[in-house]
Amino acid sequence: MRQNCRSILPDAGNLRRLRSALKELQAEVIAVPAFTARHLWRGHAIHFRCFHPEAEGIRINVMSRMRGVAPFERLWKRRTTLVLPGNATVHVLSLPDLVAAKKTQRDKDWPVIRRLVEAHYFEHRRDPNRARIAFWLTELRTPEVIVEVARQHKRAWRRLASSRSLLAFALSADLESVNRELAKEETAERDEDRRYWSPLRKELETLRHPNRGK
């Protein structure tokens, strides 16, 4: 199933434009909660499925708040704009923000994070700058590449070593320890994601079964 994930500031104008686009796509809400600004502000995802013949079966997930991710206004300022065939433009999350959004309890997200950051490194390693080096040292999840970046950029490594425990083992190429710390990072993020979603899931259960317990 194809999916399209959207982040939106749920003010009146944006919601009006989104409703118009969803109507054109013949999209319908397929699960709780209902499509309201209140649910979006609360942090819920609204799930739609398209029934227009040219988009049939596409699922659209709309959110306004994501755990560990900056508020929408900052996401918008940092966005990446892509130009598609026909000169259409699409605004997408910057790579650092996408990586932050992917740090969930879902198994499928962690290999994606690893590939995204690794691909960015191999694309830009011959043209490093301060922001890129910091991004690599704080977000890479490939032990051998972490070692490579730490050794090539020792000044940045020294500056950032205290902010990420695995960097203490990078210069010595202690891959076993780097892997151990990566596992700890992932476990901590998964646990934090579960804590974040626990009250929201309870709200969803109440919406699904409003008469339960009465």
Regions found by a protein language model. Give the residues of each.
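Compositionally biased terminal segments of proteins
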Residues: 1-214
